[in-house]
Amino acid sequence: NTVSSFQDILMRMSKMQLGSSSEDLNGMITQLESLKLYRDSLGEAVMRMGDLHSLQSRNEKWREQLSQKFEEIRWLIEEVRHRLKNTENSFEQITFMQALQLLLEVEQEIRT
């Protein structure tokens, strides 16, 4: 379940923040939180509308928002990969691996 994965990863990241004086993770955490909210609202919109395609064709702004989210996801993926390369801490490695997995899933989900 991606919702619980999001929660779990966000919790782990906030723990990492407390535990280390390393670079601030705030930006990444904020981005992940907004992505989670967006994804949740996307799911609700689709359920309410029933037909995603009519929603798309009616709503240019919605498409812009979507491509903006893809940009954010790509940025987060890069950021997470970068952190993965630079950490020796196994707790952090696991967290970032999970985050990466989740981001790729969400990207795939939004794409379909």
Swiss-Prot record:
Origin superkingdom: Viruses
Sorted UniProt keywords: Host nucleus, Host-virus interaction, Transport, Virion
Renumbered ranges of motif Nuclear export signal: 9-18, 82-91
Keyword Transport: yes
Gene Ontology CC terms, in alphabetical order: host cell nucleus; virion component
Principal location class: virion
Subcellular location: Virion; Host nucleus
One GO BP annotation of this record: exit of virus from host cell nucleus through nuclear pore
Subunit details: Binds M1 protein. May interact with human nucleoporin RAB/HRB and exportin XPO1/CRM1.
Job of this protein: Mediates the nuclear export of encapsidated genomic RNAs (ribonucleoproteins, RNPs). Acts as an adapter between viral RNPs complexes and the nuclear export machinery of the cell. Possesses no intrinsic RNA-binding activity, but includes a C-terminal M1-binding domain. This domain is believed to allow recognition of RNPs to which the M1 protein is bound.
Family assignment from sequence similarity: Belongs to the influenza viruses NEP family.
Protein known as: Nuclear export protein
Organism listed in the record: Influenza A virus (strain A/Equine/London/1416/1973 H7N7)
Gene name for this UniProt entry: NS
